[in-house]
Amino acid sequence: MHAEILGNTVIPSSENIIDSSRTPILLLRAARAGIPTLPSLVTDSVKKIITELNFPVVIFAVNPFIYDGYKIANNKSALYRALKSLGMNYKFAVCAQPLRGEMLSFKSIFGKCEQDEESRIISEKVYELFKIPLCKLHVQKVGKKVYLCGLQPLRKDELSPHDMQTISREIALISQQGEHFGV
């Protein structure tokens, strides 16, 4: 943030980091940019989730300091457990989405991933929009269609030697294109 205040270009921007770490804002911005998303509901009410989305549902934390991914609830007791866990003992709301297909989580490195074509397109579009170089994307595959559901930071222990080579190659490419890339 200090570099941004001084007028330096920072990738990703503080705004993009904050927005992408809050699932409802991530989904809203993604949908506005044409990235496929599913309907979502931000609430702390089990009753509202059941009434509006029914089962099964995917639950994401709204609190940006919880990086537990998501929880799937197929019944009321699982939904209560998910809200208690991801809502920090019901102190925070959660973001609920209908589960219509299969959940898939994968690494996105500078918008590249080793997935099917639809997932690669989502990865590229998310990178174009938020400029988050390293993240884990959570998507839902419904038939042949893929929908963005969430994003979370990658932990260092999740990066393989191959990933590190990809990162080095991408940084070298950015530098060759004349863009300043500070770490």
Region spans (language model):
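A short acidic, often aromatic-flanked loop/helix-cap motif at beta-alpha or helix-coil junctions
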Residues: 17-20, 45-50, 65-67, 101-104
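Short, basic, helix/turn surface patches
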Residues: 37-45, 60-73, 164-167
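Acidic/histidine-enriched active-site and ligand-binding environments that engage anionic O-linkages
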Residues: 49-59
